[in-house]
Amino acid sequence: MHLIIPKNYNPVLNLRDTEIAIKLVKDFFETELARALNLTRVSAPIMVTPDSGLNDNLNGIERPVSFDVLETGETAEIVHSLAKWKRQALKTYGFQPGEGLYTDMNAIRRDETTDNIHSIFVDQWDWEKIITPKQRTMETLQATVRAIYLTLRKTEGFVCAHYPHIKPELPDDITFVSSQELEDLYPDLPLKEREYRAVREYGAVFLTGIGGALRSGQMHDGRAPDYDDWSLNGDILLYDPLLDIALEVSSMGIRVDPDALRRQLAIRGCEERAELPFQKALLNGELPQTMGGGIGQSRMCVYLLRKAHVGEVQASLWPQDVQDACRKANIQLL
């Protein structure tokens, strides 16, 4: 059982008020995010076919939930994320540079190891916008991170105004740190402990350079080779004082161009993926240059509503021993 039990935990909101607050948080953040990044909400699939190449392979080992479709005889997969679908959708909808889309993404990750912040059910805002080739820079990435972080701070202010017994925790600014800098600072620490040290010091961190090899030969964390450019991506991490952890609330980046895709497919030894429809279209220059990411809805609610477990803000499945332990600890799972 992977479970942190905060000492003398007492939720700041009861079950019914929590449900009301979840709706308030999601509506406010979504509206502010769309305004900040110039995004239009669109509908999105919950399933794709394996041969489309559109599903997110995550770290490359997670198994998608799949099933056969009676009418067509096809196999369908529940999405892991919409990272690649969004880029294709931007072209389909005719978006222009500076414009983008977002959607409510619901996924099932059957191989997830659950704990206070991990669930087999994933709900996030998936967003993507078109950029120009000249905007494929760290400066563009950092400016977008700051806009998202400002939206998060506005949302925290909104929550605190509605529920005065919830006090603000977020620092005024987010700090940018590279995964290589963390390795240099803490070469003997496990990767997640490095993240913890950074957020414990700064409160809010954007950790860059996820997926590629560090000087030690290790990756800080896995990323599929065919959506983020590993040199232009990162995670938004917050210090959660209730759980005393580094809480990842967003993963985002500037997406691969043809050169980056070829390079990263070769590094991972999966050049055959270049023949899949999405990857082939990208290599042929048929898809726009984009940046995008996912922002965890339930994780944001865990943080802003001062919850101890993601199961307090979403309905999912949990092992019986976790259910029993949560009940004893006054953690009310939905």
Q: What are the functions of these language-model segments?
A:
Residues 20, 24, 28, 136-143, ...:
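Generic recognition of stable, solvent-exposed alpha-helical segments in well-folded globular domains
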Residues 22-25, 29-33, 65-67, 78, ...:
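Generic structural hydrophobic/aromatic packing signal, biased to beta-strands
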Residues 103-189, 193:
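Extended, charged alpha-beta segments that form solvent-exposed binding/catalytic grooves
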Residues 33-40, 148-159, 308:
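A generic secondary-structure signal for well-formed alpha-helical elements
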Residues 108, 178-334:
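A translation/RNA-centric and nucleic-acid-associated enzymatic feature enriched
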Residues 2-118, 126-130:
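Class II aminoacyl-tRNA synthetase-like tRNA-binding/catalytic domains
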Residues 42, 49-55, 168-177, 319:
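N-terminal pre-domains immediately preceding structured catalytic cores
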